[in-house]
Amino acid sequence: MKIIGEKINGTRQRVAQAIAGRDADYIQKLAQDQAEAGADWLDVNAGTKQSNEPEDLIWLVETVQSVVDIPLCLDSPNPAALTEAIQIVERTPMINSISGEPWRLDGILPLVAKHRCPVIALAMDDGGIPETMRTTLTLI
C-alpha cells in the first residue's frame, strides 16, 4: 500500500489562499508535515481556474520540491497544466484523476506514455459515475 498525502489541494480554502498569495511557507509546511508523517507521494492540486492552473501548478511543484524529496502526484484534469508541470518534476510523477472522458484521455494519456507515469484512474466518463458495476468495469 502506498500513502498519498492529499493536503496540498487548492479546493481547500486555506490552500487556495496560499496559492493566490504565493505563501510558500504555508505550502512547504504542509509538504514537510505529510512527508514526516510517512507519505510515499504528495498530491499537488492547484484547484484554480483553468487559465491560471498551469502557472499555479508549476509554482506548487517548485515550492514543494524545494523542501521534500518524495515523488509528486500531479492532480489536474487540465492537460495543459499537466504538460507544463511534468517538465519540471524531479522524479517521475503519478498522474491523478484520469477518467474515461475522451478529452481527458486524449490530452493526458500521451503524457502518461511519454513519461511512463503511474496513474490514478477514476471510473467515470462524460455521463458521470456509473450506476452499475458492469458499466464501471467497461470504463476501466
For the regions a protein language model found, what residue spans apply to each?
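Glycine-enriched alpha-helix->loop->beta-strand junction motifs that scaffold or abut catalytic
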Residues: 38, 87-93, 113-119
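Glycine-rich, proline-tolerant flexible connector loops at the mouths of alpha/beta enzymes
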Residues: 35-70
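Gly-rich Lys/Arg/Thr-decorated short loops/hinges at beta-loop-alpha junctions or inter-strand turns
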Residues: 9-16, 36-45, 120-128
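A general structural detector for well-ordered alpha-helical segments in enzyme core domains, enriched
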Residues: 30, 56-64, 81, 104-108, ...
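Catalytic beta/alpha-barrel core
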Residues: 43-48, 70-78, 93-103, 123
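Conserved anion-binding
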Residues: 101-140
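Conserved, mostly hydrophobic/aromatic
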Residues: 34, 85
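Active-site mouth loops of central-metabolism enzymes
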Residues: 3-29, 53, 96-100, 128-134
